[in-house]
A protein has these predicted regions:
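Alpha/propeptide regions of enzymes that mature by internal proteolysis
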Residues: 1-322
Length: 322
């Protein structure tokens, strides 16, 4: 098994667009020929678009783009730009008079980071597609990762800056990768060592406050629980699977969330994972699902380690006590 770039998986294009001043952005994953896709949502507050298409009983067997965006529900407007871009290129489901691109989307909540009135819109979605054709994807404070933060159980005063991350591996001809925007209520753990590497800081910002311990300190209802969270990501593979199998792989990839984010899948998160099939390699579903959890954990680490301090929030690179 060797490590590769997420951009080494053929059949997709990935692009970022962002507004650094406004503190938000979006990241698009495009397939010109269509990609079979599954979805597993574990968080209690998702902001999403066209998720019904991905159910096994839905007629469409492939879609043309997955968009990961900021702006919460407001940011769902960005999919219109993706649709416009793909329609102009003649990509989509042929309905005779035109081709209708099938675009699914999930968004994070980043409205409290910089300018609450700056959100991904149709123009930004279009720019992300242009970026995909320029191969402009990178990890860190870009695309949907622009406004990502973590460790928000006590609100924004003690949280840290996060971003978008990716990780991919190859075994023989099989390629499996993950891309993820880490915007969690909880803290981020290094799944190798079991130690917190980013998350909620104490009042002196000299150590981690440990969200799980704070949560366990009282079983009474936490009225102050911050609701602006969500970790959204995608597994991308060149193996051939149907929607049911891909939904299973997406579900197994959530094990990567559970290893690396604590607490995770709360009512204050909208945690979601897509699984995309963009090839014809024959592979075992359970093997790929197990591998999906591994690459997702690594992608989460990449997201926090590549983040830069911004908007007054410290990043992993700034911490002196780790």
């Amino acid at each position: 098994m060797k490590t590769i770039s997420i951009k080494d998986i053929e059949g997709i294009r990935i692009g970022n667009a962002q507004n650094f001043t406004g503190g938000t952005g979006c990241t698009v994953i495009l397939s010109e020929t269509g990609m079979c896709t599954g979805l597993d949502v574990r968080g209690g507050g998702p902001a999403s678009r066209e998720s019904e298409l991905l159910k096994p009983l839905a007629a469409a067997q492939s879609i043309h783009a997955v968009l990961l965006g900021g702006g919460s529900a407001f940011g769902l407007d960005a999919a219109g730009g993706v649709m416009q871009f793909l329609e102009e290129k003649g990509i989509g489901f042929d309905v005779g008079v035109t081709k209708v691109p099938l675009v699914c989307q999930s968004d994070i909540f980043d409205l409290t980071v910089a300018d609450a009135h700056t959100r991904p819109d149709k123009a930004m979605g279009y720019e992300a597609c242009k970026g995909a054709y320029k191969n402009n994807y990178q990890d860190g404070n870009f695309g949907v990762g622009t406004g990502a933060t973590i460790g928000k159980f006590r609100g924004m005063d003690y949280c840290m800056k996060s971003g978008i991350g990716s990780y991919a591996v190859q075994i023989g001809e099989l390629k499996v990768g993950a891309i993820v925007a880490v915007n969690a209520l909880g803290d981020i753990y290094d799944h190798h060592s079991g130690r917190i590497v980013a998350g909620m800081l104490n009042e002196e910002r000299s150590a981690f406050a440990d969200t799980a311990k704070l949560l366990y300190s009282s079983y009474e209802v936490h009225d102050n629980k911050f609701v602006g969270n969500t970790t959204i990501g995608a597994i991308i593979t060149n193996a051939r699977f149907d929607k049911s199998q891909l939904s299973k792989i997406a579900g197994m990839a959530h094990n990567g969330y559970a290893r690396s984010i604590r607490p995770v899948h709360t009512s204050a998160d909208g945690d979601s994972i897509y699984a995309l099939s963009v090839g014809n390699i024959a592979a075992d579903c359970d093997m790929v699902g197990t591998l999906a959890a591994d690459v997702m954990s690594e992608a989460i680490l990449s997201a926090v380690k590549n983040a830069e301090s911004a908007y007054g929030y410290l990043a992993y690179k700034d911490l002196k006590f780790i």
